[in-house]
Structure formats: structure tokens, C-alpha cells
Amino acid sequence: MTTKSEILNFLSSQKERLFLIGVTKLGLFGSYAKGKEDAFSDIDIVIETDAKKMVKNLGSPFLVVTFLDDFRKSVSGKFGVLVDICDTTSMSAQTKEELAKGAIYV
């Protein structure tokens, strides 16, 4: 079974590339971050983005969505587990704070 350490190492290996595009925070939350994963757990990734930078670097909002979906698929393919990506950019400060309490950022 996939471990928290394996996921965090992979996210760390992708950090520079993602940050160049416009991701400003990258982390793991949910059951894997809490060490409570089981055979049915998905991988929950939290990001924060500079939307203007991402559109500038990728060319259009559609290509930003495509890029993030491709990243989600690459994580899922690597670990053979479903992956959810949560972008906190437009969340309220309170919601971000609650999510951040359980997140492990790389």
C-alpha cells in the first residue's frame, strides 16, 4: 500500500515544476496526511495558485484546468489510487485555516 512518505516525496519532486507554472503551495491532506488511510482511501492534494501567473504561463484558463487534471492523473497513475486536488485560492480564510490544520505542505 502507498505510504504518506512516498506521496510527500513525489510531491516534493514535482514542486519546482509546479511552482514555476504558478502553484504557490502544495501539500497532502486527508486520510494519508493523518496516517489513517486504508485500502479504499484516495489521495487528497491541496494547492494554492497564482491564477494570473498560471494563465500567463499556460496560455488560457482551460489549459490551467487541463494542466492540473494531467497532474492529478500522473499522481493517480504513479500510485494506482484515485486523487483529488483541492485549490484553496478562492476559499474563505476560515476554510483555508481549517484545511491547513491537517495538511502537510512540501
Could you tell me what each predicted segment is?
Residues 46-48:
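Short hydrophobic/aromatic beta-strand micro-patches
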Residues 28:
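Conserved histidines in hydrophobic membrane contexts and catalytic metal-binding motifs
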Residues 1-25, 33-39, 52-106:
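Catalytic core of pol beta-like nucleotidyltransferases
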